[in-house]
Structure formats: structure tokens, C-alpha cells
Amino acid sequence: MSIGILGKKLGMSQFFDEQGRAVPVTLIEAGPCRITQLKNDDTDGYSAVQIGFGETREKLINKPAQGHLNKSGEGLLRHLREYRVDSVEGLELGGAITVGDFEAGQKVDVSGDTVGRGFAGYQKRHGFSRGPMTHGSKNHREPGSTGAGTTPGRIYPGKRMAGRYGGKKITTRGLTILKVDSEHNLLVVKGSVPGKPGALLNIRPALRVGAKPANGGK
């Protein structure tokens, strides 16, 4: 049973399928993650599993967090995530979550922070068309009109403008696992995932599997 796992993006490569076609893939070093806490309905009001990933130094973890992590075994972990489950039966504190819990062909959702690009303008951030570059034009990369004057006399909230681009958490849904390498803790996932190489990723079973009905399910 796959609950979810934390991993690190290694980069992109290509994978040849049975027909010899080159498929773009992302290599993810996932786990092993340690179960750091088990929650149940009696004590916490819901059932969940908390896992940790990525060892770190003692000076970077405060004392309460150290005490919490020491209950599940040796080694201080940098990243913690919690996953809701129906029941925690069969799981034990200090147990390991590995890529072996996943299988080839399984659909997963991958969450992570996108590459931060800093303050960006209208063209780069939103794909606006630029103005004329010659013939005396001074409106090269400006946005153009942002609204009327007297009415409404203001710029509506949510107007697409220049600002910080990237550096936000997003989820890429429905990616297919093409290969599981338990020896090297690797997941080979079809397509791209958020972030740059070295970024932390949260991989969990897909919430929605299969195509959505064209008529909305009616």
C-alpha cells in the first residue's frame, strides 16, 4: 500500500518504451522515509501517518523537534509530511516508507515549488504581446491600458501585472511511474515535475485516476 513519499528531483532524462520511442522522464530519488508519528481517531480525532526525510545537523533542529524525532529512531530529519489514511493498522513507529511501496504503471501526483525567477515583467510572466520596437514607439514592453479612468477609477484586483514569477507550490497530477529502482531508491516518472534539480518533492497516489467523462458524469 502506497501512502506517499518524499524525494529529491535529480533531473530529466529519456526512457525508451517497448516500441522504441524516446519518452521524456524525470528521475526522483525518493526515500527511504521514516515513520515519525502515527495518529488515530481515539487520540487525535483522525488517522494519519507522518514521515520524515533528509537527515540534517543537530544545530538546525530545536529541542522539541529533536525529542519528537528521537521517539521514532536515531537520526534527525529535516522534512516532515503528514498523510491522511483510513487506518494505521500494519504500520509501526520508526518503520520505513520506500519506493518499493509504489509500482510501475501507477499514477501519482507530484507537488513541489516551481523555479523562482524573481521579479518579472508582463511578457515573461504572463505572455503579453510587446509593442512596436521601432518607428518612434516608446511602448516596447509596457502593459498598455490597465482599465478605464473615471469609471471604475481603479484597477480591479487580480489584474495581470508585473511581479514575482515562480517560487510557488504547484501539483502536477496524473503522472505515470515507468520504472521503480529499489536498489538506488529511484522513481522514473513520465513527464516533468516542479522545481529544479535538488528540489524537495512530495509524491503520493493520484487522487483522480482515468479520464473525466465528457458529459460531466451525467
Curated annotation (Swiss-Prot):
GO terms for cellular component: cytosolic large ribosomal subunit. InterPro entries: Ribosomal_uL3, Ribosomal_uL3_bac/org-type, Ribosomal_uL3_CS, Transl_B-barrel_sf. PROSITE patterns: RIBOSOMAL_L3. Signal peptide: none annotated. GO terms for biological process: translation. Residues 124-162 are annotated as: Disordered. Keywords: Ribonucleoprotein, Ribosomal protein, RNA-binding, rRNA-binding. GO terms for molecular function: rRNA binding; structural constituent of ribosome. Gene3D superfamilies: 3.30.160.810, Translation factors. Part of the 50S ribosomal subunit. Forms a cluster with proteins L14 and L19. NCBIfam families: L3_bact. One of the primary rRNA binding proteins, it binds directly near the 3'-end of the 23S rRNA, where it nucleates assembly of the 50S subunit. PANTHER family: 50S RIBOSOMAL PROTEIN L3, LARGE RIBOSOMAL SUBUNIT PROTEIN UL3C. Belongs to the universal ribosomal protein uL3 family. This is Large ribosomal subunit protein uL3.
